[in-house]
Amino acid sequence: MAREDLIEVEAKVKEILPNTKFIVELDNGHTVVAHVSGKIRIHNIRILPGDKVTVELSPYDLSRGRITYRKK
């Protein structure tokens, strides 16, 4: 069930942090700490530096996000 107020943006993975967190750079140049969504975790999709991903941001805290899709 998707939430209506989320902001979806494209980003590029810059760095991998512990506990499946990533530093991603948005298309507009901002940097965000993002974690992996449950579906990506269940299906063991590997995310590496340089990958293009889709990130969901909450309008309340724009410094954190959730990676929901990895581009091929």
UniProtKB/Swiss-Prot annotation:
Principal subcellular localisation of the protein: cytoplasm
In terms of InterPro entries, this protein maps to: NA-bd_OB-fold (IPR012340), RNA-binding_domain_S1_IF1 (IPR006196), S1_domain (IPR003029), TIF_IF1 (IPR004368)
Assigned keywords, A-Z:
Cytoplasm, Initiation factor, Protein biosynthesis, RNA-binding, rRNA-binding
Residues forming the S1-like domain are 1-72
Kindly list the GO molecular function terms attached to this UniProt entry: ribosome binding; rRNA binding; translation initiation factor activity
Q: Which GO terms describe its cellular component?
A: cytosol
Q: Name one Pfam family in it.
A: eIF-1a
SMART domains attached to this UniProt entry: S1 (SM00316)
Location within or outside the cell: Cytoplasm
Q: What does this protein do?
A: One of the essential components for the initiation of protein synthesis. Stabilizes the binding of IF-2 and IF-3 on the 30S subunit to which N-formylmethionyl-tRNA(fMet) subsequently binds. Helps modulate mRNA selection, yielding the 30S pre-initiation complex (PIC). Upon addition of the 50S ribosomal subunit IF-1, IF-2 and IF-3 are released leaving the mature 70S translation initiation complex.
Q: What does the subunit section of this Swiss-Prot or TrEMBL entry state?
A: Component of the 30S ribosomal translation pre-initiation complex which assembles on the 30S ribosome in the order IF-2 and IF-3, IF-1 and N-formylmethionyl-tRNA(fMet); mRNA recruitment can occur at any time during PIC assembly.
Report the family membership. Belongs to the IF-1 family.
Which named protein is this? Translation initiation factor IF-1
The protein's organism comes out as: Acholeplasma laidlawii (strain PG-8A)
